Amino acid sequence: QGQALPSRRHHREGSLRAFSFSTTYPSNLCWAGICGVDENAAQTTESATATTTNTTTEAAKAEIKPAAGMQFEGVQPNEKDEVVVPAGYATSVLIAWGDPVYEDAPEFDPNNQTAEAAARQFGFNNDFAGLMEHPTDKDRMVYVCSHEYTTEPQMLPNYDPENPTDEQINIGIMGHGHTILEVSKDAKTGELKREFGPLNRRITGETEFKIVGPAAGHDLLKTSVDPTGTKVFGTFNNCAGGVTPWGTFLSGEENIDQYWANAAAVTGERPAADVKRFGVSEEASQRKWERLHDRFDLAKEPNEFNRFGYLVEINPYDPESVPVKHTALGRFKHEAGNVHVTEDGTVVCYSGDDARFEYIYKFVSSKKVKEGDVAHNMTILDEGTLYVANLEGNSPAGEITGDGDLPKDGDFDGTGKWIPLLTAHADGTAESHVDGFTGEEVAIYTRLAADEVGATKMDRPEDFEVNPVNGKLYMALTNNKYRGATGENEKKSQEDVTEYAPIRENKNGLVMELEDDYAGTEFTWNLLLVCGDPNAASTYFGGFPKEQVSPISCPDNLAFDSHGNLWISTDGNALGSNDGLYAVGLEGENRGQVICFLTVPYAAETCGPIVTDEVVMVNVQHPGETDEGTFEKPASHWPDGGDSVPRPAVAQVFRTDGQKIGMEKA
């Protein structure tokens, strides 16, 4: 997920049919990759709202012109090992895995990697991205991103998964974290160029973090290395996040289970239930880091795992600052962490728990924003109330068939309420709103606490953020093949279809639109998209004519352009087509119109979209990541070509004619 922050002051306020690749779609259409990885107060008028719900048969017969910001020729489906963009646009790489972040860092040599070098080079598998103002140089900006995870068999030569060397283990640890990078901009095209500047920084799996909020110092966070329970080294599996109005960024620790070993050694009912819920291996971990570092062995350090799974906050303008982990926001597989500031300065932070049948959360601060006071503002997320959502549909259960048929009222929609879990107070204490849990336990065992209050089970809630133009919330629900499953997966189904999850064995995902009262406890919701093949009866595109939309599946990260259009990046390629970035209209006759803007290289995921009037950026994650691909036999050669190993990288797209993104020529 990506965000641009051009000016801080503005932020106060069913199975798919397979198509052959010879199929050509209308110029505004494109095939979306299907997700192969299934685990891991608006200001619009009533009349505008009325026009966005359904489209008449007569309107469906005529092709509808794309909205401003979406006026480009859609990219056709492909399996090319490159970034494919519309005619009139060009693409380049800003930075790739291994490129130096510091001027004294070595150039990347894939055959001679070291942990020492990796700590000063661009990390692996960049995911979340943000583009922020430069504090002193009007000709530069600051690019920030997370490095979610490493894929050692494809990044390291002579790698044996069962017996990694000590150096290989440490290279992997250093490949995680974040990069902060100064960039300059071409005045004509908007293309960005990386620079060596004093703000450049790499945060790794060994960087010191401070634990803050109600769980800080609790016995469950104390280890032999840190008996205070307030200091932890590193951050792992940082997925989506968000830029804050006070000039920091948030990043969610997501699939942390893969780094730890020996869950079978964990004792106590609640701790054991927690590691099982996260999916920690009962024996050796995937990467075998526990062989070199005791902290990844639950048999030796049972509390180290409790120090991960939080939203972290980083100040990119102070390279010496210590990043923090916010325990008041709860501990789970955080996907996203997006902030909205109400008119009175209250901060609301939204986040999803990216796993099947998990929950969505928001945090409402008790402190107010103080403009220009970063030190104060970085404590805002330590005091306030954490909520989890409960959703209800407006239609009788019998009208939800599981096949995507709309209920009689014509919409998948309903209401919701936010249920309080804990309140963190100014004196450092935490008040629990869950019977049987202390406030500190709610902060650590958030999933288990949410179970107790009747939270709603969702289909892998990922990116979740407020549209700055219309004030509504949008959430990507990537998929859930176990929803209402039958046959071999029946035992894995925790819940049947419902109005908020109306597709049985949901392989293609949903996009939900919410109108929240922000600091309050009630909201309404509707499904904007039921993703998949528009020829399938199960799909729905906000009432837009199906024959004029791109098929889209497995929505993951979200962004918004200056016109208020929604942009969605996808994750997966089960039908063989490359992933992409899609623009979606939200208002009037364009509501639900989906057009493909780009596709990424073979077997890559599209992450961290940033959409400005001058440039579109995506993080190209894990190009060539297949079961067969290795360092010696790569499945992709992007971005360097030839016989090179693939490198995750930042791709940028810009106009060649100097016009604005998504606008017809003046």
Question: Where are the regions that the model predicts?
Answer:
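Conserved small-residue
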Residues: 13-29, 35-39, 49, 55-666
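N-terminal secretory signal peptides
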Residues: 1-5, 9, 13-14
